[in-house]
Amino acid sequence: VVIIKLRNPSQTICVNRYYTIRPDWDLIKRVLYIGIPSGIENSMFQFGKLAIQSTVSTLGTVAIAANAVTNILENLNGVAAQGVGIGLMTIVGQCIGAGRKDEAIYYIKKLSKMAEAAIIISCLIVFALCRPITILGGMEAESARMCFEMTLFITITKPISWVLSFIPAYGMRAAGDVKFSMITSCASMWLCRVSFTIFLCRVYGFGPIAVWIGMFADWTVRGIVFTIRFHSRRWLNHHI
C-alpha cells in the first residue's frame, strides 16, 4: 500500500523509479553507529532481567506474584518521565545538528527537572493505588504486603536516583555518545543490579526486595557516572 501511494504523482514525495535508488552507505554507517550500541544495551538489559527473574523464581509463588505486580507498578510510574526522555532525544539531536551546543545543555537540564516532577507525581499516584490494586487483583495477604513494601521502597528511592541515571543519558545518546552510555549501563546493571540481587537472595536470604535494592544501586551508580560525564562536556565532541 505504501509503495502504491508513493507512486502517486499528486503526493509531495513521489517515487516511481525504484531502480534508480541506491543505498547511501555513509548515512547507513552513521545510523548503525548509534543503533548498534543501543541495541546491545537493550539486549544486555533483557538478559539481566532474565537472570534476576530466574533468581526470584526460587523464592516461591508468593514472592513471584508480589514481584510481578510490583514490576507492573514500577513501569507505570516511569512512563511519563520516559516520554520526557524520548522527547529530549529529538530536541538535543536538533540542537547538536544546528551547532547550538549550549542549547543542548540547557534543554537536558530543563527536561531533567520536568522528568523529576513527573516521577514524583507518578510515584505518589501509583503508591496511593497500590493497596486497591492488590485487593482488586485478589492477591494473598503475604503477597499484598510484600508488594506494598516494595512499592513504598520504590516511591522513596526512585525520585532520588532515576532521573540522573536515565534522562541525561537520552540527551548524550542523541549527541552521539552512545558507546559510553552502552558500557556504563551494561556494567552497572551486571555489577550492581544482577549481582546484588543474586548475592542478597542466595547469601543473606533476602526476599524479592533484593531486586529493588539492586536496582536502586544500579540507578545510583549510573546516575553518578552520567552526571560526571555530563559536566565534563566530553559528550559534545562527537560528530554524527
Language model feature labels by segment:
Residues 1-2, 82-85, 154-174, 180-192, ...:
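Short runs within selected transmembrane alpha-helices of multi-pass transporters and secretion channels
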Residues 43-47, 119-127, 190, 194, ...:
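Hydrophobic positions within alpha-helical transmembrane segments of bacterial inner-membrane proteins
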Residues 64-130, 162-186:
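Small-residue-rich hydrophobic transmembrane alpha-helices
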Residues 1-36, 92-158, 201-240:
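Short alpha-helical transmembrane segments in multi-pass integral membrane proteins
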Residues 38, 42, 51, 63, ...:
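Short, flexible micro-motifs
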Residues 43-76, 94-95, 132-141, 201-204:
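Helix-terminus/linker motif at the lipid-water interface of multi-pass membrane proteins
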Residues 1, 20-51, 55, 76, ...:
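Hydrophobic faces of transmembrane alpha-helices in multi-pass small-molecule transporters and flippases
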Residues 6, 46, 127-128, 136, ...:
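Conserved catalytic core of Hanks-type protein kinase domains
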